Amino acid sequence: MPSCGRVLTPAIFSVVLLVAGPAQGQAYPTKPIRFVSMGLAGGGTDYAARLIAPELTRALGQTVVVDNRAGEVVPADTVAKSAPDGYTLLMNGSSLLFLPLMRTNVPYDVVKSFAPITLAHQSPTVLAVHPQFPAKSVSELIAIARAKPGELDFGSAGTGSSTHLAAQLFKIMANINVVHVPFKGSSASLTALMGNHVKYMFCTPGSVTPLVASGRLRALAVTTLKPSALFPALPTVAASGLPGYEMVSTNGVLAPAGTPAAIINTLNREIVQILQKKQIRDAFFNAGSEVIGSSPEEFSRTIKSELAKWGKIIKDAGIKAD
């Protein structure tokens, strides 16, 4: 008499697969998740990762550990080369998009190496001048620059930084001849602006807000396309004579390419819910960012459109990263 239970017929085997498949998908996650952040420890990207990680730990029931990796290439490359199993994630900074456009030796492809999960938040820059500089509006700044071609200079946190690219776009759209003075980081560039050693600069919100409040700098405009809740008293550059001008840093969460859609969707659902919590929104807002919380598809489209936009600007200007 044949033994029962030792041989699975094709029909029974199919049923087993149907039952086991969803159960395996529902098991994620079964171990701690590494959340790699780009940039300096304590910087904006690292701060965002540390806001999200404890909430994601509670939501998923597994510890989410923030792994800050110094530099711009190493963190992204680490995630790109990790197993696509949902246990290694990336909190990206703006350099994820910009750096491959300015260097030829970047080991990852922004579109092909990652699976977008959600666009978490966006940060604009603020156009600021020294209080003694005569321009009190964007149009006045442009008029002065046009009247003195090649004489005005602007600072940035470094070649290829978001503050540099914001100014480069401004230069192109305003059709002005101005001189770029790159510094090593925001602190040095802001010190130069406060010392009236450069005439204007596009600054990150967190760094410029207290300086404007104390009267050490004067803000002229914000670089969002529409009025920003972060700076309700400031006009946009777009509404101040340069229609269509926009510069916002795109920051989100990504996984290695090939990560199963079920895992991407789980992470998207949980992270978007986290981003809608008032305390999280307030924390981002106070740090100079506005929460987004997009679908994976929306984030993917944003990445591609940003690459196309800035790729042309960087190529035409011949910008090479430091």
Annotate the PLM regions.
Residues 81-87, 101-188, 237-239, 248-283:
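Hinge/capping helix and adjacent helix->loop/strand transition within the periplasmic-binding protein
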Residues 30-32, 172-176, 261-322:
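An extracytoplasmic/periplasmic, membrane-proximal ligand-sensing/linker region
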Residues 20-22:
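N-terminal signal peptide c-region/cleavage motif recognized by signal peptidases
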Residues 1-12:
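Bacterial N-terminal signal peptides that target proteins for export
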Residues 96-105, 171-173, 200-234:
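A ligand-binding cleft/hinge motif common to bilobed small-molecule-binding domains
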Residues 25-112, 151, 159, 175-202, ...:
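N-terminal (or domain-start) structured segment
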Residues 91-96, 156, 186, 203-208, ...:
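Beta->alpha turn/N-cap motifs
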